């Protein structure tokens, strides 16, 4: 068995990636989320495939086909709600995974980090298009509002929006192409994940101390396989609780009524995992400015390696940077809350303050405090 594991052309790749991989001996549970994301992706592809077998991408039948899946297909409701709530778990793991990268300075592995940012954008695009497919009220109006943001691009904006819509409004053509993209993108994501892992295994994992761990490595299996399995069980628990006890808890109520192009819902809002970006978008009164802020709120991750002024890679021994990091987390919670609120007096101001804080923390406060810490530690 040892020979085939180490000599077979295909199995030896798996072996060097998941079995005999030398891993740092001290990586904490924050490193579990990579494998959990892999599990989420597998779940989404499997449940999505079964949903696609019964779904019809047509404006007249899309909504009723989803109803049919929930009512008439064997365990269709389980598959549908696993897929919907699996997306929430996917994003929860994604945000923690990115946060861990920020906290422990994993962004110095620049190729892995940049592929990760591309993955984040791709997953967000996939989730957005998936949200449109059931053709509920919020699906239709969400698609209309978000695609319409492209009209803010000077000169070509309007043509671009009509090109994406495949007409003069969100209609059958839009739904069909969104379904096509929503189906193909997870496979592109899988390919990108392989590239992500390829680059990661070139350098090896970072660790909580942020120091080279070459002298002290342990094999991935059995130590981290069993640890990842525990993480997976702890992820499945809340997911199953959501699916079986309150499957619509994280969804918008308006998505449960069929789309009506003639009546706009009072508050258009995306799923919870986009609310922070949506709040940043809404906090700027100018349309183009809002769109740029929205894109830059995620793209800012790409320039974080350039803003690294600290002599220590990890934040583990930098209490001031830790404080700023947790203020950033609290700020993202605030933005998420504001994104779900109506555009009224106190919320507008809070949203603008939180947006300014978000950018100033990353661009100004964190690099400055890192320099101060260097001085204090006499580095």
UniProtKB/Swiss-Prot annotation:
Its cofactor is heme b. Heme 1 (or BL or b562) is low-potential and absorbs at about 562 nm, and heme 2 (or BH or b566) is high-potential and absorbs at about 566 nm. The lineage of its organism: Eukaryota, Metazoa, Chordata, Craniata, Vertebrata. The cytochrome bc1 complex contains 11 subunits: 3 respiratory subunits (MT-CYB, CYC1 and UQCRFS1), 2 core proteins (UQCRC1 and UQCRC2) and 6 low-molecular weight proteins (UQCRH/QCR6, UQCRB/QCR7, UQCRQ/QCR8, UQCR10/QCR9, UQCR11/QCR10 and a cleavage product of UQCRFS1). This cytochrome bc1 complex then forms a dimer. The chain crosses the membrane at residues 33-53, 77-98, 113-133, 178-198, 226-246, 288-308, 320-340, 347-367. Binds 2 heme b groups non-covalently. It is a multi-pass membrane protein. Heme b b562 binds at residues 83, 182. One of its GO terms (cellular component) is respiratory chain complex III. It is found in: Mitochondrion inner membrane. This is Cytochrome b. GO terms for biological process: mitochondrial electron transport, ubiquinol to cytochrome c. Keywords: Electron transport, Heme, Iron, Membrane, Metal-binding, Mitochondrion, Mitochondrion inner membrane, Respiratory chain, Transmembrane, Transmembrane helix, Transport, Ubiquinone. Belongs to the cytochrome b family. GO terms for molecular function: metal ion binding; ubiquinol-cytochrome-c reductase activity. Pfam families: Cytochrom_B_C, Cytochrome_B. The keyword Mitochondrion applies. A ubiquinone binds at residue 201. Heme b b566 binds at residues 97, 196. Component of the ubiquinol-cytochrome c reductase complex (complex III or cytochrome b-c1 complex) that is part of the mitochondrial respiratory chain. The b-c1 complex mediates electron transfer from ubiquinol to cytochrome c. Contributes to the generation of a proton gradient across the mitochondrial membrane that is then used for ATP synthesis. InterPro entries: Cyt_b/b6_C, Cyt_b/b6_C_sf, Cyt_b/b6_N, Cytb/b6-like_sf, Cytochrome_b, Cytochrome_b_C_euk/bac, Cytochrome_b_N_euk/bac, Di-haem_cyt_TM.
